[in-house]
Amino acid sequence: MDLTIIFVNYKSENYLYHCIQSLYRHCKERSFEIIVVDNFHVPGANQSILTEFPKTQWFIQDTNSGFSIANNRGLAAAKGKYVLFLNADTLAFDNSIENAIHHLEQQPEIAALGAYQLQEDLTRHPFYWSQNQLRKDLYILPSHPIFQKLLFSLLPKEHFQSAEETNNLVGFFMLMKKETAMRAGAWDEDFFLYAEDVEFSNRLSKIGKLCYFEDVQMIHLVGNNPFRRTKISFVNRFSVQIQISNLLWIRKSYGSLAYLIILSNYAIVLPGYWIWKFINNISKGKSLLFNTENQILFSRKLFVLFSYIPKMLILKDFLFQIKPEENIDLKEK
């Protein structure tokens, strides 16, 4: 078996049907198997997939334990030399998967490959090329170039040997040898959702190069997000679950100091955010608490983030999944 394609399903059977259909249409040069790990099984919802693609292996999880745990179950069952972790809301439209495997075969120094994300009109989705680009956006700082240059100067320097090399693969498409995935320690099961791909990329980059190539691309439809942000502003721009996962990645990859520095940034911003609003309201003849929804929402989110500090610092095995009442973005809809 050349390739195992692993999907994590969460109410995405319709996307998955069309994705698998596109794979059989465009992946004809390699033997491959498809494994689906279902985090939210609805009896009968997968019938059209299993009827048309009866060789699909379908594993049902007892609970929705997140992306990493599901991927690891698929990885354990994989028989292919190569494994491709692929989102259900994607479509193959050319020979990109064959091209990706060819790159791995020809360049053994590469540990894993990503793919460029295309929209339906085949224009590219923007994404974070490097981990420093993502780390920079975790801070709440003025957008003036002086602050941005200062922040970049404080982050560890990133050195890439070619235009294709990166240290951050987007988890919608990650291809590697199965033995490479196992050697890196597989997916970190402390992550529930989000940022697990960045953390995994960090460990994979210690084994070999991570790359994007122009001839490896997939359409990414970007399905529904149960942690969609609401009431977005420059300061209040983080989803709680996404930010918990981002902070976990920082803690695991860069240590407790890097994690605490980001939280300190938020702690400094909070009173300033309130004071600015008070002054603004007074100058306009409004009451102090007029239109302070964003300040209140930001305060509530920080309360949740700070409540996880003990677990983040100790880092014992723990699934960092927020409680329903902590999903403030959903509650605000």
Predicted feature residues:
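Glycine-rich, basic loop-to-helix element that forms the pyrophosphate-binding segment
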Residues: Q61-A78, N99
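Short, acidic, metal-binding catalytic loop of nucleotide-sugar glycosyltransferases
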Residues: Q21-S31
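A short, conserved alpha-helix in the catalytic core of glycosyltransferases
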Residues: H159-Q161, E165-A186, D190-Q217
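A conserved acidic beta->alpha catalytic loop
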Residues: S22, V36-Q47, T63
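Active-site-adjacent helix/loop segment of glycosyltransferases
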Residues: L210-S287
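Short, flexible, basic/aromatic active-site loop/helix in glycosyltransferases
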Residues: N132-T166
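Short aromatic/hydrophobic "clamp" motif used to bind/position activated sugar donors
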Residues: V83
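Conserved donor NDP-sugar-binding/catalytic core segment of glycosyltransferases
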Residues: D94-Y128
